[in-house]
Amino acid sequence: LKKIKIEEALIKVLSSPNHSNKNWITNQYDQTVMCDTVQKSGSDAAIIRIHNKDKAIAVSVDSSANYCKSHPTSGGKQIVCENWRNLISVGAKPLAITNCLNFGNPENEEVMGEFAECLEGIKEACEFLNYPVVSGNVSFYNGTNKKNIFPTPVIGGVGLINKLSIPIGHIFKKDKSNILLIGKTFGHLEQSCFLKENYSIEDGMPPEINLHNEKNNGESLLKLIDKNLILS
């Protein structure tokens, strides 16, 4: 691979439609109807206050077509865990999910295989995290000029925040605060936005996911947030 300056690489990633600011879309809609919005879109999850209660619900919607195309089973697990993390990151206990399963022509054996494997990954992650699927729908025959779309299951999750004082955002609150990394990093570059945007490389496998670690990390973070030990 050719050498690239980190500043140039970052600009390319942030300039991509997949990673750039989405405010031009969300600002066209009223996000504060009935004055119940605690946290708008743009953070890990949106938060809405429950009427006459010192509680709120958090909502996050997630997908990863690239992961699901490269390894459908792993991709299915990845998007459930991403959704799980996003809710926990704002102080919400994940309760349940719905899904929208978007795929190409099921008469194509490869597409049907992707569908079955994605479902297996979603099922495995949901069962392990005790994160039930309460509803969903399937959309087949998506494509253009006989070219099927990537397998694109979308997960929408809802979590409960027990106190309105709990929700946390993604913006730093105080100078000189400690920054903590929860979990391990493995330097995995395959299927990364860095390779795709800077080198047009979309090969390889998504990073491995350990459901035991996901659950332990998530539950530990929730405890820290409940004890007011996390600022953002």
Q: Which stretches of residues belong to each language-model region?
A:
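Glycine/proline-enriched, intrinsically flexible loops and inter-domain linkers
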Residues: L1-S232
